[in-house]
């Protein structure tokens, strides 16, 4: 069974798959935050036009940008998301029992739902603020 037959979210448990996301990563050789080390710390590369070095933990979904060549990915991950369960896994993912893996993935899924819920709440609050302003402007016209 190859990695391609795994669901996309589960493919991210494989370090090589995470490494493959680091296209056009600005820090390659002679740096602490190489693609290999970033992937080992759980990060995937998800650049934007304004944030070419944006990396996100596939597990806790913490996003970090503004990397410096001497930044240690594991230490940065611990500093900004110390509760990430990925950081405490002692086995290679290929060595986990099915029960261990599913328990771990349940935590990842909870993190994903929390992140998506938080994003939707922010989006709703921004929309509500715009609507409130529009209503106030209409009321001022009367």
From Swiss-Prot:
Q: Which residues are modified to Phosphothreonine?
A: 34, 48, 117
- Say which domain of life the source belongs to: Eukaryota
Q: Which residues carry this modification: Phosphoserine?
A: 20
Q: Where are the BIR repeats?
A: 18-88
Q: Which InterPro entries match?
A: Baculoviral_IAP (IPR051190), BIR_rpt (IPR001370)
Q: Give the positions of the site Interaction with FBXL7.
A: 126
Provide this UniProt record's keywords sorted from A to Z.
Answer: Acetylation, Apoptosis, Cell cycle, Cell division, Centromere, Chromosome, Chromosome partition, Cytoplasm, Cytoskeleton, Kinetochore, Metal-binding, Microtubule, Mitosis, Nucleus, Phosphoprotein, Protease inhibitor, Repressor, Thiol protease inhibitor, Transcription, Transcription regulation, Ubl conjugation, Zinc
Compartments where located: Cytoplasm; Nucleus; Chromosome; Chromosome, Centromere
Q: Which GO terms describe its molecular function?
A: cysteine-type endopeptidase inhibitor activity; cysteine-type endopeptidase inhibitor activity involved in apoptotic process; microtubule binding; protein homodimerization activity; tubulin binding; zinc ion binding
Question: Mind telling me which GO cellular component terms the entry cites?
Answer: centriole; chromosome passenger complex; chromosome, centromeric region; cytoplasm; cytoplasmic microtubule; cytosol; interphase microtubule organizing center; kinetochore
Q: Mind telling me which Gene3D superfamilies this protein's record contains?
A: Inhibitor Of Apoptosis Protein (2mihbC-IAP-1), Chain A
Describe PTMs of this protein: Ubiquitinated by the Cul9-RING ubiquitin-protein ligase complex, leading to its degradation. Ubiquitination is required for centrosomal targeting. Deubiquitinated by USP35 or USP38; leading to stabilization.
Where are the N6-acetyllysine residues found in this chain? 23, 90, 110, 112, 115, 129
- What does the entry list as the binding residues for Zn(2+)? 57, 60, 77, 84
Family indicated by similarity:
Belongs to the IAP family.
Record text about domains: The BIR repeat is necessary and sufficient for LAMTOR5 binding.
Q: What's the subunit arrangement here?
A: Monomer or homodimer. Exists as a homodimer in the apo state and as a monomer in the CPC-bound state. The monomer protects cells against apoptosis more efficiently than the dimer. Only the dimeric form is capable of enhancing tubulin stability in cells. When phosphorylated, interacts with LAMTOR5/HBXIP; the resulting complex binds pro-CASP9, as well as active CASP9, but much less efficiently.
PANTHER family reported for this sequence? BACULOVIRAL IAP REPEAT-CONTAINING PROTEIN 5 (PTHR46771:SF3), DETERIN (PTHR46771)
Q: Function of this protein? A: Multitasking protein that has dual roles in promoting cell proliferation and preventing apoptosis. Component of a chromosome passage protein complex (CPC) which is essential for chromosome alignment and segregation during mitosis and cytokinesis. Acts as an important regulator of the localization of this complex; directs CPC movement to different locations from the inner centromere during prometaphase to midbody during cytokinesis and participates in the organization of the center spindle by associating with polymerized microtubules.
Q: What name does the UniProt record give this protein?
A: Baculoviral IAP repeat-containing protein 5
Give the source species.
Answer: Bos taurus (Bovine)
Could you tell me the gene encoding this protein?
BIRC5
């Amino acid at each position: 069974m190859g990695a391609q037959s795994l669901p996309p979210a589960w493919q991210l448990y494989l370090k090589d798959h995470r490494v493959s996301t680091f296209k056009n990563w600005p820090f390659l050789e002679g740096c602490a935050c190489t693609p290999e080390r970033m992937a080992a710390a759980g990060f995937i590369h998800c650049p934007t036009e304004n944030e070419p070095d944006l990396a996100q933990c596939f597990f806790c979904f913490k996003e970090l940008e503004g990397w410096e060549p001497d930044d240690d990915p594991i230490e940065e991950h611990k500093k900004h998301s110390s509760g990430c369960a990925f950081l405490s896994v002692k086995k290679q993912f290929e060595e986990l029992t099915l029960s261990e893996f599913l328990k771990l993935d349940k935590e990842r899924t909870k993190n994903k739902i929390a992140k998506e819920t938080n994003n939707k709440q922010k989006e709703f609050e921004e929309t509500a603020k715009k609507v409130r302003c529009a209503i106030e402007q209409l009321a001022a016209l009367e």
